Amino acid sequence: MKVLVVVALLVTLISYSSSEGIDDLEADELLSLMANEQTRKECIPKHHECTSNKHGCCRGNFFKYKCQCTTVVTQDGEQTERCFCGTPPHHKAAELVVGFGKKIFG
């Protein structure tokens, strides 16, 4: 019973301190947070071309997408590099395992 009371008290204190922390944000901090959100929205989505900006891919569910490049040969015989944002195979495997674990354990 004492442990339950102590845990409830700790949860109350933590939630109170975190709510005060949110209230203490100043307008400048809010503007910088909004600017960060804007730059996050300007990232390159999955399956879109990232040839000119190889580090600008968005985040997926668990990992950031990687810019994956291939060499394309045109009909003229010229080789060009084309890149797209995608999920690497090892990240796909990790997401599959996590998704399977969530289904099993709830």
Swiss-Prot record:
InterPro entries cross-referenced by the UniProt entry: Spider_toxin_CSTX_knottin, Spider_toxin_CSTX_Knottin_CS
PROSITE patterns in UniProt: SPIDER_CSTX
Propeptide residue span(s): 20-40
Tissue expression per record: Expressed by the venom gland.
Molecular functions per Gene Ontology: toxin activity
Pfam families: Toxin_35 (PF10530)
Coiled coil: none
Subcellular location: Secreted
Domain note: The presence of a 'disulfide through disulfide knot' structurally defines this protein as a knottin.
Protein name (Swiss-Prot/TrEMBL): U1-lycotoxin-Ls1b
UniProt organism field: Lycosa singoriensis
